[in-house]
């Protein structure tokens, strides 16, 4: 079966595993998914992400993070730019998520980065997802 939106599939797998408090989730790998996992780790939304080589494209193993009392660190994930409706932001229109409490993941000409990094670098791009 052909997957039309692999980034949405990644976010849905993380969201579903987070809702049932799984320790880890495995996602088919791609370059952009590795970059998204790197950003989630840097921003403290996940504990770790590792790439596991297999005979095909590889797997990204994402270890989810929970707070004291087993409360979720990730409260929401939302795909913004979709294959049917791409969403772009200019360098002066980069969105803030929940007034800066969340994070927007943006694909720019210089790579995949957070909304804060895009504002500092004065670059715009495709708004892939919001996470809070």
Curated annotation (Swiss-Prot):
SUPFAM superfamilies: Ribosomal protein S8. GO terms for molecular function: rRNA binding; structural constituent of ribosome. Signal peptide: none annotated. Gene3D superfamilies: 3.30.1370.30, 3.30.1490.10. Pfam families: Ribosomal_S8. GO terms for cellular component: ribonucleoprotein complex; ribosome. Keywords: Ribonucleoprotein, Ribosomal protein, RNA-binding, rRNA-binding. One of its GO terms (biological process) is translation. The keyword RNA-binding applies. The keyword Signal does not apply. Belongs to the universal ribosomal protein uS8 family. One of the primary rRNA binding proteins, it binds directly to 16S rRNA central domain where it helps coordinate assembly of the platform of the 30S subunit. Part of the 30S ribosomal subunit. Contacts proteins S5 and S12. This is Small ribosomal subunit protein uS8. It comes from Brevibacillus brevis (strain 47 / JCM 6285 / NBRC 100599). The gene is rpsH.
